[in-house]
Amino acid sequence: MQLTQTNCIACGNKLPVPIISNIGILCPTCRNQGLFRKKIIITGITRMNSGHVCVSGIDPQTWSFIRPVFSCGLARDFLMQGTSQVINHFNLVEIEFKQYRPDQKFHTEDWVINENFAPRFVRHLSNQEIINVVSKISITNLNVAIEKQDKSLFIVMVQSIGRIWHEQYEKFRVRINFVDWDGNLYEKIPVTDLLTLAFIRHQINIGNMNYSNQIMSNFNNNPNRYIRIGLTREFHGQHWKQVTALITVPDLFDGQSFSYYENLIGGQV
């Protein structure tokens, strides 16, 4: 599906002329700018291979998703300032980028990080601000949104989580069944959200095997309930769905970070 870009992906200003393109377009000023220092509302912190993480969020200037990328992967140190986790869900964080580097399909959100600039914490959003953000950018039908092939990150309004469970093979895994707001069922979707993974691993360690019912009850009875979905890079001919955050207001995890739970379990999840 071809889309028409009318605004600059970096600054949000109107382009001189509309351009038919799946990916974002830079205006002439931004194209010649060089470094971009942008404030990002963090909405996703996910587990990758080899101890790396993936971070992404929303640019409140353009209301588009941004995924900071680094040539050799993002180490967990990128998220921290000393012992404090600077990059946390719904923190506003300033990050400097070298360039916009989108794929032609799905992964149109990629921006290359300037590794010489440490992320700077600005503030944490209030509950009302979080509600305003997710209300503005959320979708009700994940299948329809994916058909456009113009993004790989989505915040989905959800009717309910039907099941959540863990598996242990070569590494600890969690999967979810859920129904989006329009009634579509998604089954056995893997969870890569570090906070959810670390929380559930901690619950198991303390012997709380009823964690599934507790999460579903707290999530399904919250009036503000969303699941953030990310699509993988192409693998075996598909872009696979992953759950990259469980979002509720008030917060399902009482404002705790994944690093808090990893400290409790004594290692990386």
Task: Kindly give the residue locations of the regions a language model identified.
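N-terminal ordered "arm"
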Residues: 36-95
